[in-house]
C-alpha cells in the first residue's frame, strides 16, 4: 500500500455527525482544517511521555491564530481517573473554553479515551479530534466514539458515546514506539482479522517478524484494514445495541485481567489472553472448529503476545467479569466465533465449561 493518505468514512448514527479517519504520514497539516474557523480556543490533551509533541502542536496551533493550551496528563491508564478528568475541566474553565472550541487528544488509547470523555462532559459536549500515536489507539480507541475513565469497580464503567470530529493516524508516530507497545496494539489488529477480515491474519502469518515492526511492508495495510472493520461496525451501531458487541471479542476476560492487575498490564496483552480464552470457550461450547481455535494460539504466539494468565486468579476474574459492561443481569456474556469471521454472543455459559476453557489459559 502506498504512503498516500487513505480516508476512511465513519457514518453518523444515533444523531452523531459522520467523520473521517485519515491514515498516512505527515498528516498534522490537516489538523487546522478539521478544527475549523469557528473555534477560538484549542486544548491539546497529551500524556507526559509526549510533552514535546504536545507543546509543539500547541505552538503550531498558536501560530495559526488559535488560543492554544496544552494540558499534560499522566501516562497510560493512570490518566483515566475522575481526578485527572477534573484537572482537565479546571484547565478548560480557566481558559474560558466554550462550546465552539475544540479539544485535541494526542497519544495512546488511554489518552484519547480521556480526551474524548473530557470533550463529552465539558458543557455537555464539545468537538474533539483524535491524534492517536500507537497502533492500539489508531485501530481501536480513537475510532468509534467510545470515551471513558476507569473506577475502582472496573475499566471504562464511566463514559459516554461521543464520536470525534476527525481522526489523524500519522504512521510516522509509530516509528519511535517501543516494541512492546507496538506489539500490544497488534492484539486489536488480530482481533479484527478473526471477527471480520481474515486477510489481516494472512498478512501477519506470511511474516510475523515483519508484522512486529512499523517498518514492515504491510504496516499501513494492516492498520487501514483494521480501522475499516471497526468503521463498518460502528457506522451501523454506535451505541452497542447489537452488532458493535462483536468488537468486544477477547475483552470480557481481558478487562477482568486488567482490573486484577490494577491496569499495569498492557491492554493488548490482556486482550490477547482474552482471545485465547474466547477461542477455547467457543471450541468447548461446540461452536468453533479446532483449526481456527488453534490458529489463535499460533498467530498470537508468533508476534510475541501472551497466551496465559495465573490459574489461581480465576475466582477473582469471575467476580470482575460480573461487573463488566457487557453483562446482562447476572448473566455473563462472551463474544465467541461460530467460525472464522463469524462472531456471535454466548450468554450464560455453564460455569464448568468456563472453567475448562480457562484451564487452557491458566498457568
Curated annotation (Swiss-Prot):
This protein's GO CC annotations: cytoplasm
Protein encoded by which gene: aroB
Binding site for NAD(+): 109-113, 133-134, 146, 155
Reported cofactor(s): NAD(+); Co(2+); Zn(2+)
Subcellular location: Cytoplasm
Molecular functions per Gene Ontology: 3-dehydroquinate synthase activity; metal ion binding; nucleotide binding
Annotated coiled-coil segments of the chain: none
Keyword match Metal-binding: yes
Family named by the database record: Belongs to the sugar phosphate cyclases superfamily. Dehydroquinate synthase family.
Class of this enzyme: lyase
Binding site for Zn(2+): 188, 251, 267
Designated name of the protein: 3-dehydroquinate synthase
Entries under SUPFAM superfamilies matching the protein: Dehydroquinate synthase-like
Biological role: Catalyzes the conversion of 3-deoxy-D-arabino-heptulosonate 7-phosphate (DAHP) to dehydroquinate (DHQ).
EC number: 4.2.3.4
Pfam families listed in its UniProt record: DHQ_synthase, DHQS_C
Main location: cytoplasm
Pathway assigned to this chain's UniProt record: Metabolic intermediate biosynthesis; chorismate biosynthesis; chorismate from D-erythrose 4-phosphate and phosphoenolpyruvate: step 2/7
Catalytic activity: 7-phospho-2-dehydro-3-deoxy-D-arabino-heptonate = 3-dehydroquinate + phosphate
Co-factor remark: Binds 1 divalent metal cation per subunit. Can use either Co(2+) or Zn(2+).
Cystine crosslinks: none
Highest rank taxon of the organism: Bacteria
Record keywords: Amino-acid biosynthesis, Aromatic amino acid biosynthesis, Cobalt, Cytoplasm, Lyase, Metal-binding, NAD, Nucleotide-binding, Zinc
Amino acid at each position: 500500500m502506498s504512503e498516500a493518505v487513505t480516508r476512511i468514512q465513519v457514518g453518523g448514527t444515533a444523531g452523531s455527525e459522520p467523520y473521517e479517519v485519515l491514515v498516512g504520514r505527515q498528516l498534522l497539516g490537516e489538523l487546522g482544517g478539521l478544527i475549523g474557523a469557528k473555534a477560538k480556543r484549542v486544548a491539546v490533551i497529551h500524556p507526559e511521555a509526549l510533552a514535546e509533541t504536545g507543546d509543539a502542536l500547541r505552538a503550531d496551533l498558536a501560530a495559526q491564530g488559535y488560543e492554544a493550551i496544552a494540558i499534560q496528563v499522566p501516562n497510560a491508564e493512570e490518566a483515566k481517573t475522575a481526578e485527572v478528568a477534573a484537572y482537565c475541566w479546571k484547565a478548560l474553565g480557566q481558559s474560558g473554553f466554550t462550546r465552539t472550541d475544540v479539544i485535541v487528544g494526542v497519544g495512546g488509547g488511554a489518552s484519547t479515551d480521556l480526551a474524548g470523555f473530557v470533550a463529552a462532559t465539558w458543557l455537555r459536549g464539545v468537538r474533539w479530534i483524535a491524534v492517536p500515536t500507537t497502533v492500539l489507539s489508531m485501530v481501536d480507541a480513537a475510532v468509534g466514539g467510545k470515551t471513558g475513565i476507569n473506577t475502582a469497580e472496573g475499566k471504562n464503567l464511566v463514559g459516554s458515546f461521543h464520536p470525534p470530529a476527525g481522526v489523524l493516524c500519522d504512521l510516522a508516530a509509530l516509528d519511535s514506539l517501543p516494541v512492546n507497545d507496538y506489539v500490544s496494539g497488534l492484539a486489536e489488529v488480530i482481533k479484527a482479522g478473526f471477527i471480520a477480515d481474515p486477510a489481516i491474519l494472512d498478512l501477519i502469518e506470511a511474516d510475523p517478524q515483519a508484522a512486529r515492526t512499523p517498518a514492515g511492508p504491510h504496516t499501513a495495510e494492516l492498520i487501514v484494514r483494521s480501522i475499516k472493520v471497526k468503521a463498518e461496525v460502528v457506522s451501523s451501531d454506535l451505541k452497542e445495541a447489537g452488532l458493535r458487541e462483536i468488537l468486544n471479542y477477547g475483552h470480557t476476560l481481558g478487562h477482568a485481567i486488567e482490573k486484577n492487575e490494577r491496569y499495569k498490564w498492557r491492554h493488548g496483552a490482556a486482550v490477547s489472553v482474552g482471545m485465547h480464552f474466547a477461542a477455547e470457550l467457543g471450541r468447548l461450547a461446540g461452536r468453533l472448529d479446532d483449526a481456527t481455535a488453534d490458529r489463535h494460539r499460533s498467530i498470537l504466539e508468533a508476534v510475541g503476545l501472551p497466551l496465559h494468565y495465573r490459574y489461581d486468579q480465576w475466582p477473582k476474574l469471575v467476580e470482575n467479569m460480573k461487573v463488566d459492561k457487557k453483562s446482562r443481569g447476572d448473566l455473563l456474556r462472551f463474544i465467541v466465533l461460530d467460525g472464522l469471521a463469524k462472531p456471535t454472543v454466548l450468554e450464560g455459559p455453564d460455569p464448568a465449561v468456563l472453567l475448562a476453557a480457562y484451564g487452557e489459559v491458566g498457568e
